[in-house]
Amino acid sequence: PAFEKDSCGVGFVMNMKGEKSHEIITQGLEILKKLEHRGACGSDSATGDGAGILIQIPHLFFQKNCTGIKLPEPGRYAVGNIFLPVGEDTKQGQEIMERAVVTEGLELLGWRDVPVDNTTIGKTARSVEPVVKQLFVGAGPDIPDQLAFERRLYCVRKRSAWGIRRAGLNDNNESFYTCSLSSKTLIYKGQLMAPQLETYYLDLKDPNMVSAL
C-alpha cells in the first residue's frame, strides 16, 4: 500500500436501485470540484491538466436534442465524444471515423455538435481547443448482443486512430481524440480545471441529462 500512489483523484456516486436522475450528475460534478487539489496547472492558472466525468448514456436527452437522427432503442446504438481538428481538417477527421464505422459493419446514424462555453478556460487550453462532436452509431441487424457491439466499437476506435495517423492529422498536435465510444457510457472531459467542466459542457446542465452512476 505504501507504493500505491497516483496524482489523479477519482470519485464515485451511484443510485443503488439503478434509478437515473440529474441529481447523480450534479453530485458527481460536486465530487469532482472537491478533488481539484489532486489536479495541477502551470503558469496559466486557468488551464488544468485534465478533468472529466463518466455517465450512462442519457437516452431521453438525446431523443430531444438530436434532431434529424433516428435513434434505436437503448443498447442498440452508441455515442462517441470525439475531439476533431479545427478548420479544414474537421471534415476529414469525420470522414475517417465514418469509414471505420462502415468497415466494421455498423450503421452511421449521424453527428451532433456538442455545445460548449470556452469563456472560463485558460489561454493555453483555448489555444489547442478542438472541435467537439458526438458520433452516433447503430448496431445493425447482424450484431447479436451488446457485448458483440462493444467489440465492434473498439475496432472502430482503433481503425480511426490508425487512419488519422496515416492521414497525418496528428503530426503536429493531438487534436484528434476519441474520449469515449460506447453503447453504455459517455465521457465528457478536457484540458480543464475541475470546476470548469460543468461550465464548459452545457449538456451537463440540462435536467434531461440523467444517469444512475
Where are these regions (language model features)?
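N-terminal segments that mediate ammonia production and transfer
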Residues: 1-213
